[in-house]
Amino acid sequence: QLEFGLFDFRLHAEFRPDQGAKILETLAEIKKLVAVVPSPSWGRFPHAFSHICAGGYAAGYYSYLWADVLAADAFSRFEEEGIFNRETGQSFLDNILSRGGSEEPMDLFKRFRGREPQLDAMLEHYGIKG
């Protein structure tokens, strides 16, 4: 997901074909930074990656990872205070579920969590940090 999100950002923010930029070279640069598994030189993944240019995803593919950050961080409060802690559940209901789209999502998250989102819980969930 990180590779896809970075590729999406680079294409929408920096990609300049009129200045000689090439899609496969752009992806290769990103893969050097973050890829875990090498891909074959004959691969043409970008030619079929329609998400980044269709369906409202333009420069928004990162949202999959961002959703994981928010979900893991919110759940970590339950882990810290007890999965079945009534007060934690009520706070989640009051500050997230019952508010829906009536307020800015980040304001609701910060009200529930008491702080800005942090990556630690997601990294731990992925087994990257322990």
Over which residues does each language-model region extend?
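C-terminal, non-catalytic "cap/extension" segments appended to globular domains
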Residues: 1-130
